[in-house]
């Protein structure tokens, strides 16, 4: 990480929102010597990185993000002593399992050589696709987790990535001979919330696969709240303060400060700061587009899920969707504003490897599917049908469940507009101008946006907040 010279005169910063990006921004500002206050509307800090008893007492569920390849692989988080504040990463033997209808599962192995062997006829093609970036992860991660366009620091590496990343997932999948490998890649690419025939869907698929081999897909012991608690603990050591149950409806409600960083999406920024921003910038924010939402279920279980494919118990994360064609149809339906009859389901079973999540012998599971933004459709039956498809009898072991519609999610985290967990659709049009061509800067010199609606986008990595704070500090240092 690049150091920033400390200011000789004491300056104050206010940060709105205590999600990972807000806390990252606050830490960067505090490291530069600013007095920092963070204001959080909810009673618990963390935004999408919170852990709560959502079903039964003693069962700990992640409200938002649960599995963190970009958390453990974040250049900024890796530069902080978060382990000293209780953050411990837990890895399952394999990062991901993708069960199929024949009673087997295709596994995304952690080691590339194991992946080559397990993917059989496609093993070599898979390694060709991801090996350069896995082997040079420490160079690759900072490249992909910074604002674009940018002059690459490792041009040959990024040129090679770009040759594949500009393709759709559908095109990349044609490199594989086996339907099993195509299905595996479809599930990875579906994290894009794009149709799998769209440009950038292939890039997201690669960006999910590469860290699986480079750093894994771990969970924090005790839940995602552990990430938040570690960030808050380190911020407190630097002198920063987090004020929970402190919603900010207008910048006028903030104490006097030199700079404000907003871990909010464009819609909230308009409401909070619109009066301080010029009309042209406000119109740009109004044109920002949100992506599909999610319908989420948290489960308290009597026992572990009995998967037909026993190897599924080796992974924390499962992708439930069958073949490439089925997943592609599901994502295309959602992208077109419809609900998939057989939705692609993402499922995490962290308590298999972290006993602190549930009472002895019991388990927690987290699952969601994609839906149109703002959907009011109850997807419970369809999600459970997909789980039962690969784990018959699943419903019989459910002690309690809690569902979250798009509106429910937004009520608990205002950044999840219409249930969008990515901070806005990440298509070609919104890849560079996110949320505008100015990215973190606004039309007001002392106001910045630092949420997942800025580069590099969604995920618990803190890099949006890191880059926004660096931008603000550079401007302050130059008196601009």
Give residue spans per PLM region.
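N-terminal glycine-rich phosphate/pyrophosphate-binding loop and immediately adjacent elements
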Residues: 7-135, 425
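Conserved FAD/dinucleotide-binding core of flavoprotein oxidoreductases
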Residues: 114-117, 267-273, 300, 359-386
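A glycine-rich dinucleotide-binding beta-alpha-beta segment and adjacent secondary-structure elements
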Residues: 178-195, 341-346, 393-455
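Helical element adjacent to the flavin cofactor pocket in flavoenzyme catalytic cores
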Residues: 207-248
């Amino acid at each position: 990480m690049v150091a920033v010279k400390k200011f000789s005169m004491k300056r104050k910063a206010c940060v709105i929102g205590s999600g990972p990006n807000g806390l990252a921004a606050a830490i960067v500002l505090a490291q530069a010597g600013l007095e920092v206050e963070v204001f959080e509307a909810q009673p618990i800090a963390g935004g999408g990185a919170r852990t709560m008893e959502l079903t039964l007492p003693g069962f700990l569920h992640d409200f938002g993000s649960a599995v963190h390849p970009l958390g453990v692989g974040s250049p900024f988080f890796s530069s902080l002593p978060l382990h000293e504040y209780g953050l411990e990463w837990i890895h399952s033997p394999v990062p991901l399992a993708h069960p199929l209808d024949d009673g087997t599962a295709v596994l995304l192995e952690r080691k590339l050589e194991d992946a080559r062997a397990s993917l059989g006829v496609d093993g070599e093609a898979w390694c060709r696709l991801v090996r350069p970036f896995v082997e040079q992860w420490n160079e690759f991660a900072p490249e992909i987790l910074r604002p674009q366009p940018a002059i690459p620091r490792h041009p040959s590496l990024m040129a090679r990535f770009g040759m594949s990343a500009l393709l759709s997932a559908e095109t990349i999948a044609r490199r594989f001979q086996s339907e099993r490998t195509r299905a595996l890649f479809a599930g990875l690419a579906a994290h894009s919330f794009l149709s799998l025939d769209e440009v950038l869907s292939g890039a997201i698929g690669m960006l999910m696969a590469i860290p699986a081999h480079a750093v894994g897909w771990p969970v924090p012991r005790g839940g995602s709240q552990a990430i938040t608690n570690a960030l808050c603990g380190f911020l407190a050591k630097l002198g920063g303060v987090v004020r929970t149950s402190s919603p900010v409806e207008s910048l006028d409600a903030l104490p006097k400060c030199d700079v404000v960083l907003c871990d909010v999406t464009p819609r909230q920024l308009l409401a909070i700061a619109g009066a301080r921003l010029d009309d042209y910038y406000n119109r740009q924010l109004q044109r920002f587009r949100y992506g599909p939402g999610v319908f989420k279920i948290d489960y308290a279980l009597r026992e572990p899920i009995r998967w037909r494919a026993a190897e599924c118990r080796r992974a924390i994360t499962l992708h439930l969707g069958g073949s490439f064609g089925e997943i592609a149809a599901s994502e295309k339906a959602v992208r077109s504003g419809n609900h998939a009859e057989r939705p692609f389901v993402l499922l995490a079973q962290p308590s298999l490897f972290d006993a602190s999540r549930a009472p002895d012998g019991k388990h927690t599971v987290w699952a969601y599917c994609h839906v149109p933004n703002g959907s009011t459709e109850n997807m419970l039956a369809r999600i459970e049908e997909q789980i039962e498809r690969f784990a018959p009898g699943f419903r019989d072991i459910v002690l309690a469940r809690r569902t979250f519609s798009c509106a429910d999610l937004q009520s608990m985290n205002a950044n999840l507009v219409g249930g969008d967990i990515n901070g806005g659709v990440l298509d070609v049009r919104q890849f560079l101008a996110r949320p505008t061509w100015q990215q973190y800067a606004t039309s007001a010199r002392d106001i910045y946006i630092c949420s997942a609606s800025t580069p590099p986008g969604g995920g618990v990595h803190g890099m949006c907040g890191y880059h926004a704070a660096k931008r603000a500090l550079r401007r302050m240092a130059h008196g601009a």
